[in-house]
Amino acid sequence: MKKLIFSLLAASALFVSFAFGKSVKNEETEEPEKTSNLIKNGDFSKGKKFWDMFLSNGSADQLVTENGEMEIRIKNPGPYEYAIQPYFDGFSLYKGGVYKYSFDVHSSIDRTFEWRLQVNGRDYHAYVGGWDSVGKETKHIEATFTMREPTDFSPRLVLNVGMGKGCPEDMKGHSIFFDNFDLELVDASGITEIVTSTTTSNVNLNQLGYLPSAKKIAVVRSKKSAKISGAFEVVDTKTENVVFSGKLKNAKFNGASGEQTAIADFSKFSAEGTYKIKAGKYGESFEFKIATNIYDGILKSAVRFFYLQRCGTKVQDADFGHPECHTTRAVVYGNVETSYDVNGGWHDAGDYGRYVVPAAKAACDLMLAYDHNKNAFASENILDEIKYELDWMLKMQIPGTGAVFHKVSCREFPGEVMPQDEKDRLVLCPVSTAATADFAAAMAMASRIFKDYEESAKYSSAAKKAWEYLEKTPFDGKGFTNPILFTTGAYNDSQDADERFWALAELYKTFGDEKYLELLKAYNPVEIGQDLGWQQVGLYGLYEYLSSDAPKDSFYQKAQKAFLSKANEKLKNVAMDSYDVSLSMYEYVWGSNMGVANNGMLFLLADKISPNKKYKEAAKCQIDYLLGKNTTSYCFVTGFGTLSPILPHHRPSQVAKKPMPGMLVGGPDSKLEDPFARANLSDAPYAACYIDSV
C-alpha cells in the first residue's frame, strides 16, 4: 500500500490531468425532448454567470451593462479573430436534432465578427456558424440547423471578436454588445440515440479491492433527509452466495458531499475472490476483489505512465507511442542568440511543456517511494525513469552560475496533437529562485539515492552549485511570472522560503555539512511546514531534516511538533468525513486529488517520525478514496475500476480518443473554474464538483 501511495502522489504532482468528472444519477436513461432555452443566463440577468472569455494575444474586459447586455470592451483586438473569444459551455447537441439558435448584437463601431457552435477541442470545427457585420443598430442573428454529426455532449458557443476578416485594418478600442442568446431543440423526431447518464452507485468503495488483512469499508449514501439504517451483505459474484453480512453503522449527514451516509464494515471478511456489496433499498456496489496482488497492475501502470510521458526520445507503445520530439535547441527568452540543448525529461500534465518546479516534486516523490520500499520496484526500472528526468533537469542549470531556468516550452499551448507535431520554437523562460531551490533539493536527494551509481557525483555537484547561486541571490519579492505573450503553465510562487529550507535540509541530510544546518535553523518550522505540494514544499524539508542525523535539540523538537501538528490536522479531517478523506469541506479545489495523495504521503512520513497506527490507516483511506470510495463513484485513476475518467485533459489521450492508463485526474473542484463544470454543477456539493469532460 505504501508504495502505491507514493507512486500515485508522484503522478498527481506532475501529471494531474484536470478532467472534471460528472457526479450524476444511478442508471437512468432518457430521450431528449423539445426544450426551452439551452443557454443558461442567455439574457445576463445573473451577470456573467456561466459565461467566460478566452484571450490569445488580445486584450478585453467582459462586463454586463446596466441594460443587461454582455459588453466585450476591447482594448487590443489582437492579430486574429479568436484573439478575443467570449464563450459558453454546458449544453449538448444530439445527432439528428433540429435546433434554432439566435441572439442580438450591436457594436460601438462598424466591424465584423464570427459566431459558432463548435467542437470544443481537436480541430475546433463549427457545427454551425457565420460571419456577420454589425454596427450601432441592434442586429438579430438567427439560424436553424440539423445536427448531422455524432452527438456532442460538451460543445462550445463562441463569439470571435478579435481582428477578423472584414474588420477595419486600424481597428482599435471599442465595445461590442450581446444579448438574448437562445438555443432550442425544435424537432427531436430525428434523434435515434438513447442518451444514457453515467452509472454511479449509492454504495461506494475501493473499486480495485482490498488486501485480505486490510480494513474494508464501504460508504452507503442517500439524498433523502432520513438517516440511513438497515443491513448489508457481501455477495460472491460467481455464486451469488452471501458470504458476509452486517449492520450499517455510523449514520450521519456528511456536509462535504451533502448527503446522508452510513458505513458497511466488512473488515473481518478476508477470503480472496470477487464480490459486491448489497445494501437493500440503497442498491449495490461495483464489483471489487480481495487478493494479495490487487495493486500490482495499477502500480505498474502508474510507473509506466512516466515512460509514456518521455520527451525527446522514441516512445514505444501501441496506442501512445511516438517518435522523437522537441529535439531542437531552446533559445533563451530575451536573448535569442543564446540557445541550449534541453532534450529529455517528462512532458507535463496535459501539455508538452517541461517545468522544473513540479518536475522536482515528482522526481523526489518517486525517489522517496523507492527509498521506503526498494523491493516493490525491483521489476519496474524506477531508477532508470527517475534518472531520465534528473538528467533533463541538469540541462536546465546554467553551467557558469548554477542558476536554473524555470521552464522550457513553446509560447502557447499546442492544439490536440501528439508531441512530435508541436513544432513551435522552444523557449527557456527566465531563471527563478524557486526552481533553483527545488532543483538543489532534488539533486541533493538524488546524490543520496544514487550513491552506488556513478551519477551520484554529478547530482552532488549540481546541488551544491545551485545553492551557491541561491546564497548570492535573495528572493526578488515577486517570484516567477510568465513573460509577455506566454500562456503555458507558470507554476508561480509568491515566496521561496520553503523551497530554500527544503534545499538546505536535503543538502544537510546528504552531505552532513554543519553550515547547511545552521542556515536551516534561521527558518520558522511552523511557517515553513504547510504542504507537500509543488508550490508549498516545506513539509519535505521538515521530514528530511527530522530523518537526518541532526541533534535532537530545541529546534528539532519545534520542527517535529510542527510536522506532526500538520499530520494531525489532516487526521482530524479523516475522522470527521464519512468517506475518510483528509480534505476539509473547503479543500475541494483545483487538483484536490493531489491534496489527497499528498496527505496520504504525509501520514506515511509522520509514521516514520512518530510511529502511530492511525497514520497508517489514514494513509490507506486516501487510497480508498482515490480508487472509488467517494461521492462521485469514480475511480480517479484512468484505466482502472468500473467507473473511471475517459476524457482527461491530456493531449495524447485526446488524440488517441482513449485515456492513457495510470493517470490520476485532478478531482473535484468546488470553485468550478472549468466553464463546463460551472454550467453543469452550479448547485453541486463541494465533494461532488467533478465532471468527466475535457
Set out the residue ranges of the language-model regions.
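Low-complexity, Pro/Ser/Thr- and charge-rich linker/hinge segments at domain boundaries
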Residues: 188-204, 213, 285-320
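Short Trp-Ser/Thr-centered turn/loop motifs at beta-strand boundaries
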Residues: 88, 129, 282-288
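Extracellular and organelle-lumenal recognition/adhesion modules and their flexible linkers in secreted
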Residues: 22-192
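Structural beta-strand segments of beta-rich domains
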Residues: 99, 201, 214-218
